[in-house]
Amino acid sequence: MQFESKQIELKNGKIATLRAPRTEDAAALLSCIKQCFGETDFLSRYPDEFNMTVEQEATFLTRALASPSQLMIVCEVDGTIVGNASFQATPLRKMAHRAQVALSICQAFWGLGIGTAMLTALVDAARSAGLSQLELEYVEGNDRGRAIYDKLGFTVYGERPDAIRLADGTSKSEILMVKQL
């Protein structure tokens, strides 16, 4: 799915670009994703569990960019990818109106408005694509994420207890949210 690039002013005054990733972004995007996995327990993996090669990521990006049911966006600041967001609709006809949302931002860029801007762009694109429902999960305790989701009209519809077990044995629930478009 296509995405038209846009520039946004961050809360710190810097300019960020939201754009579709390119296959040549594979290494930088992998680096960003792996960094995000290491900076927070609010994502699904540890960095050592993410072993995609640059070639595999480039192939994935090529397929994703050609997909009519998937949208990927990266956020670039000063030439560096610092976040990514996506939605993936299901190909099953009975559920083709729904899409799953994912979002991650490097910790140094939290609180600057990137999450809100990327999620707003996803909501607008999903609406334009004819989708009528976006869904996401977040790990309990992710108050920053929850604030963005609430602000953009997502509502809680359930909880998956004991969904995440951290290395120290701590158990966390996933909170399930939905937005009707």
Q: Whereabouts are the PLM-identified features?
A:
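A short beta-loop-alpha structural element at the N-terminal edge
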Residues: A16-S31
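Conserved G/P- and acidic residue-centered "switch" motifs that form tight phosphate/ATP-binding loops
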Residues: D25, G79, G113
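Helix-loop element at the rim of GNAT/NAT acetyltransferase active sites that forms part
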Residues: S31-D48
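Conserved GNAT acetyl-CoA-binding A-motif
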Residues: L119, A126-E137
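Acetyl-CoA-dependent GNAT
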Residues: F37, E49-R98, A102-C106, L119-T120, ...
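Short acidic N-proximal helix/loop "leader" segments that mark the beginning
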Residues: M1-N12
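Conserved catalytic-core motifs of GNAT/GCN5-like acyltransferases
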Residues: E135-Y138, D150, T155-T170
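Active-site acidic-Proline motif in GNAT/NAT acetyltransferases
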Residues: L103-A108, L112, E140-G141
